Amino acid sequence: MPYNGIDNYRHNEPDRLGVLITNLGTPDAPTTPALRKYLAEFLWDPRVVEVPRPLWWLILHGVILRIRPRKSAEAYASVWEKDGSPLLIHTAKQAEGIREAMKQRFGTNVVVGFAMRYGNPSIPRVLEEMQQQGVRKLLILPLYPQYSASTTASTFDAISKDFTRRRWLPDFRFISHYHDFPPYIEAMARHIESHWAEHGRKEKLILSYHGVPLKYLLKGDPYHCECHKTSRLLAERLGLGKDQYMTTFQSRFGREEWLQPYTDETLKALPGKGVKSIDVFCPGFSADCLETIEEINEENREYFMESGGEGFSYIPCLNATPGHIDALVQLVEDNLQGWDIPENTPESLEQRATLAEERKQATFPGRSDI
């Protein structure tokens, strides 16, 4: 197979470090055709749905993609903004915040980009752009604090697949999780405290994470454990007792058993147990998206209030808040340790080009195609 290379490489071009942040993805528009395309890519990933491919193809194309895109398009339309989906907007702002911090410290020697595992901007497209910008050392940061094969490993798969098509591979580092990274815990704690200072504190804090099938845990996926560790560390930092917070799991899909307790069932039951007011925060979501804005702040709010609840306060995700950007920058800088920042002064680039030309003339005299 042909491999993608770099045409017309010149030795006076800068070498750079790259930082690529990724998130799950978003459709290109809140329309049925766009959702059908997006869901086809997302739900066909074997990391997401671990069902034998022939059987799953029939279910996906014969049933799901005929029914779900229209319903999902309506949900996305309810949260869509003029600049696109909330997840895309927040992720772009997060990348810009990290980029500005890197620029202040390293100038133009560090390139920061963002990509989506599904949809656009795609991982292959952004990797190609970074290669063309001279990235020779690459750090990948999937914005999933808690590791799961269905998210983090899927991102690794996509990057590895792209690398199989490239002739020149960069040095490569991959951050698989940061569920217990102290600056991340601190950023969440201060964010929640700020919300409480402005809006008051409810009886109980619900920490809702995206769910995964229970069988993933039984097969060794650490996601469940990492979610609970994040919750424990956050609660300790906030000074909460065990009866003052709960860890729940949302967004289940299909009929099989997922991680429990389920967020929706928990919120329906709490008022009957005497808990009349709650704060809800989603530590596993680095940015607000359909699952937080529509599912939690609208759908689950309604479940709680209709069941007898009297107060429901949704605490937004960290998004591109200064505390979150600071935590992500520290995570990036910690993982760049040991990599020398390229020296791209005009003098050093000219010297490198001169030495390369001398070697070329000595080895391939008279050749103009090298």
From Swiss-Prot:
Describe the function of this protein. Answer: Catalyzes the ferrous insertion into protoporphyrin IX.
The coding gene here is hemH
Instruction: Give the family, as the similarity comment puts it.
Output: Belongs to the ferrochelatase family.
Q: Name one GO molecular function term.
A: ferrochelatase activity
Q: What class of enzyme is it?
A: lyase
Query: Which NCBIfam families does the entry mention?
Result: hemH
EC identifiers of the protein: 4.98.1.1
> Which keywords accompany this UniProt record?
Cytoplasm, Heme biosynthesis, Iron, Lyase, Metal-binding, Porphyrin biosynthesis
Give the UniProt subcellular location, in the record's own words.
Cytoplasm
GO CC field: cytoplasm
According to its UniProt entry, the protein's GO biological process terms are: heme biosynthetic process
Q: Name its species.
A: Marinobacter nauticus (strain ATCC 700491 / DSM 11845 / VT8)
Where is it mostly found? cytoplasm
This protein's record includes keyword Metal-binding: yes
**Which pathway does the database say it acts in?**
Porphyrin-containing compound metabolism; protoheme biosynthesis; protoheme from protoporphyrin-IX: step 1/1
Q: Where does Fe cation bind?
A: 210, 291
Question: What is catalysed by this protein?
Answer: heme b + 2 H(+) = protoporphyrin IX + Fe(2+)
Listed name of the protein: Ferrochelatase
